[in-house]
Amino acid sequence: MDRRAGEKGDKGRGTVRRLLVINQYYAPDVASTGQYAADICSGLTSYGFEVHVVTGEPSYSINSPDAPDFEILNGVNVYRVPFGNVKGREDNKTRFKGYVRFLRGAWRLARKLLRLRKFDIILTFHNPPFVGLLGALLAKKYKIRFVYIPYDIHPDVLVATGWRIPKLFVWVWGVVNRMVFKVAEKVVVLSEGMKNTLVHGKKVPAEKIEIIPLWGKPELDATSSDNLIREELEVKDGELLLLYAGNMGILHPLDIIIEAAKRLQGKSVKFLFIGDGAKRRYLMERVKNENIEQVSFLPFQPVGKFVQILVSSDACLVTIDKGLENLALPSRIFTFMSAGKPIITIMNPEADVAKIIRENNCGWNVQTSDELAELILNLLKDPIELKQKGKQARKTYLNQFRRDKLIKQYAQLLK
């Protein structure tokens, strides 16, 4: 592995702040936390930070691209822990092997970098579980600042979704979290609901928590529909194309969408799922077995193709399961809003995402398959409402969730 960027020493460093970031995923991997980490890290270089990232070999999907052990990517020094043939997330055994391999390799690699040069800040996200502990231990050992960014709150998310986790393990995980929160100078969360969970449920001091939401990934302009793409997807004139894109995992009640599609058989609507996750295979088998013709699936798409599909859709679906409203936040909503697409949220109306949509009049919220089917039938009768909500989504995005605005908040926090 090329370590040249880590062996230059500190000569001529001046007042540059040196940041060590640790996360299992990073660009070009398709995992959303890795993509956001890459945006943050490359954005911070324009504010005078020298950024070094310890990450894993791309592995989120079995189709993840190859990447070198070391590269300078958009001004960021990226060091990768090799994963061999451990790729994908469809079964827990593969996930666990990836977690262990990354944590072990990241610990060794981060310690080597910290011995080679002086860092000012360690920053970790939440992939994999316990990477925050790794960051906290290193920060204590080398007496430097530590910032923690949990995009999901674990193990609460897993417990809430019915995972059978031994009580002792949940207790140990809680002890680890308390240590991480104690060592962290700042904890960055995505929403007010997540902050309330940490303050009231985890006893994290409110003054330690910062709220910085997400932005569109990719961040788009409002663009006209691509008729060729609609033809390729076999969407007929007058049909609605409803898009679900992202993780098809345990956090998402996707059966509601499938059930609504089943009730809308023969109507002028198509549902397209793009992405991967633990539920994907099950959903595809259900659609096939029940002969639900207007539902189709695609794997993660290259960015350019995904953008073409997104701008050609009529509305986008965003989900989060009951009980998870204050533990996680589906990030795709911001990409959809940046493209000027109306949003249909399927979740508790008090979830942070549902509140964003309701308060800014850029979509609708439903909780059941009956409600979703009824809404779609109404939209088929009134397509003008789709365009109006889409324009409002774009306006809201520009006012509240632009990437440059939010990266600046990270720069101010870390200085």
Predicted regions span which residues?
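N-terminal subdomain of nucleotide-sugar transferases
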Residues: 2-77, 261
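A short, well-ordered alpha-helix in the C-terminal region of glycosyltransferases
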Residues: 378, 385-399
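Conserved donor-binding/catalytic core segment of Leloir-type glycosyltransferases
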Residues: 236-252, 258-261, 272
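Nucleotide-sugar-dependent
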Residues: 252, 302-309, 316-337, 342-355
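Nucleotide-activated donor-binding/catalytic signature segment of Leloir-type glycosyltransferases, i.e.
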Residues: 268, 272-275, 281-307
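Membrane-proximal helix-turn-helix segments that form the acceptor-binding/catalytic region
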Residues: 130, 137-141, 168-187
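A short helix/loop element that forms part of the nucleotide-sugar donor recognition site in Leloir-type
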Residues: 65-70, 221-235
